[in-house]
Structure formats: C-alpha cells, structure tokens
Amino acid sequence: RNKVKQVKFPFHLRVPKWCKQAEIRVNGKMEQTVKGGKIAIVDRIWKRNDKIELYLPMEVFTSTWYENAVSIERGPLVYALKMEENWEKKEFKDSWYGSYYYQVTSSDPWNYGLADFDRNRMNEVAQVSINSQKQQLDFPWNQENAPVEIKMKARLIPTWTVYNEMAGPQPFSFCGSAEGGEQEITL
C-alpha cells in the first residue's frame, strides 16, 4: 500500500470549443473558469479522495454548411429533425463492404425552414427539454431513448424537393415560398 498522503502535480483538462466558459471545481469549491478551446491546468497539492469536477454548460448554436444549410447544435451534438423511421435491410452482392446494410427512409415531411431564425437568439427561440429518466438509460443513441429534444418553429418549404432520392439543392431564398403557418418541429 502506498504511504504517500499527498502529491503535487498539474492536472490538465481540455475544454471543448463549443463550451463558451467552463467551470472547474475541486472538492465542491470553485477553482477556476476557462474559455472554450483552451486547456485548463489545475496545479496543486492533491490529497487522497480529492474530487475534481468539470462543468461544461451547453448552449444552442448554429453552424453553416454547403449551400448555406444551417444545422442546430447543442454542446457536442448536432440535432436532426425527428421523423418516423422505416428501416429496410438491403443485401450487398459484393461482400467488400459487408453482406448487408440498412436503408432508412421516412414518409414524413422534411423540407422545413426555421421560422424565427436569428443566430444571436438561439437560446431564446429553441426550447430544450431534458428527460431525466431517459438520461439513466444504457443506450441513449436512438430516437426512442434520446434524453434531449429541441423544439423550434418552422415552415414547410414546398419548393425544396427530393433530387436523386435525397434532399435536393436548397432554394436560394425561402422568401414567399413557405407554405402554411408556423409549425413546431422537434429535433
């Protein structure tokens, strides 16, 4: 058994860039705050049973992709429109990639544009709900068990259509092309 009661060393923690400002606590007391994208160093004398906690507050934000497509993100996750999933097993003739794969399709509408889109107000317009019971599940990586949902207002864009069995090019402008009133969508 090791007789050393305490030891001094630096403890390095990487704070991801998506986190605006993290908090580090040692034994329940605030040690320091660190901006995202930085390495925090807690250099101290450590004793047996010391406890270090890293808090990474998650905010809703957006990122822009090809053809000005916008994705909704919160913390390290990118959210997708919640849709009914139809899973179909497909066989490969050539086993180079495996013997089969699953094709996932949906008959639900997918071509929505965000109705109240303002990058600077995402935490106001996006309603985040966290199901604490689902947070305890062993496998949260599917729609049924996902513990976090984001609800937003959107409008259907009928001019944005399927092309080659996938989402076609986005219309240059959605002005005047939205159909019907605002709907609440779930991501």
Task: Give the positions of each predicted feature.
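Solvent-exposed beta-strand/loop surfaces of large extracellular or lumenal domains
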Residues: 19-44, 62-67
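Surface-exposed, short loops/turns at beta-strand junctions within beta-sandwich domains
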Residues: 46-48
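A broad, low-specificity signal marking well-ordered, structured residues that form hydrophobic/aromatic
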Residues: 11, 40, 70
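C-terminal beta-rich recognition modules with glycine/proline-rich loops and embedded aromatic residues
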Residues: 1-2, 35, 55-187
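Beta-strand-rich binding/interaction modules
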Residues: 6-26
